[in-house]
Amino acid sequence: MTIDGLDGATAVVTGGGSGIGAAVVRLLERSGATTYVADLGTAPPVDVTDREALDTLAARMEAEHGGLDVLVNAAGILTQNLPVDELPADDFRRNYEVNVIGTLNACQAFGSLLRARQGAVVNVASQAALVSLPQQAAYTAAKGGVAALTRSLAIDWAEHGVRANAVAPGFTLTPMTEAFFQNETFTRAATGRIPLGRILEADEIAAAIVFLASPLASAITGVVLPVDGGWTAGEPALPW
């Protein structure tokens, strides 16, 4: 599969070394975009909480390309499951620092390059930004912050022709989540709650992200798009 309108584009994907981010990189490249990966595993490593590292990559992009067409913020973390009253403040801060501040850092570092090309930003939120998950208060609050930040970006950058959207993935098999799905009880419960009845693949999330980043979505901005197999639509059919 390829997405039309991206041949010759330039793109940056934070968290592009694995999981959803890596799937986005593959699809962007198949669609003809020159794609740069900003990840802890790249050389040099890029930590989204380190604004200087992002600024260095942005300077390289400006020197080599003069602008940026697509920014995908897929870098994120998921910490331990704990009820709210047992949640360490450090866990909450760490989730916010990586998931929200990291997204903000990247948007600020690459903002002028996006404005130069009237580009597009797509942030990776979560179904947890729309429907809270039990014992995931830190992650839920952080991804809710990503969704709210996305809407603010859409308003602030519209006058520059820059679009900002987010996807809200449902349960997706990635290196970050694979431990959950090794638990058969959890997997049965999760798939039983998803109307489509299955765990999603990273490539399915990537398809939605790259669509939103492409000219095919030229009139779409400020949207948080659930890609969740129907999780946020409601309960699966009842056996009447």
What is each of the regions a protein language model found here?
Residues L82-V84, P88-R93, A190:
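Substrate-binding pocket helix/loop in short-chain dehydrogenase/reductase
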Residues V84-D85, V131-A137, E159-H160, G197, ...:
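Active-site loop immediately N-terminal to the catalytic Tyr-X3-Lys motif
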Residues C107, A142, T150:
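Active-site helix of classical SDR
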Residues S112, I155-E159, S218:
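Alpha-helical segment proximal to the catalytic Tyr-Lys
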